[in-house]
Amino acid sequence: SPVQFRFKCSKLPTVEFFCQTANIPGISLGQATIDTPLKSIPFPGDELNYQDLGISFLVDENLNNYKEIHDWLIGLGAPQNHNQFSTLRDTGTDRFPGQTTNSPNNNTVPDGGTYSDATLTILNSKNIAKVEIRFHNIFPTSLGALSYDVQASDVNYLQANVDFSYMYYEIVQL
């Protein structure tokens, strides 16, 4: 039987039920090399590199789920004015699974709506949650195009791809 999963991000509530594919991103560790007269010797580095989290989802007929991601990207990039980023930042009470806040004395700009946390839940053959991959501080980096085709003979549902960057993820056995 195919492995089932759920993708949950409170900043994207309408994407969860339409999610078609998701990946557990790869991770790599940099390394340092010390040259010796006989052989170069590798040593573990101190920086982890995470690949992007990619998901694909069916787009609803009103484009609501596509617009959620689109508006998040617009807010991050602020292509028309700086108020777009301020508005996004001020909507930052939507963290999942836990809310992260800055302390009032750290003199930094609160991250607000810039980031969200997300969870990819892996289900067993009986649809019981077995593993959670918890992504911390995700934000979208790309949203795929939508292609309309009036000549298609079958019912083709619109599907879009989105890539996220994030700080790190953890794998939790349930």
Give the location of each predicted region.
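Glycine-rich, low-complexity intrinsically disordered segments
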Residues: 1-174
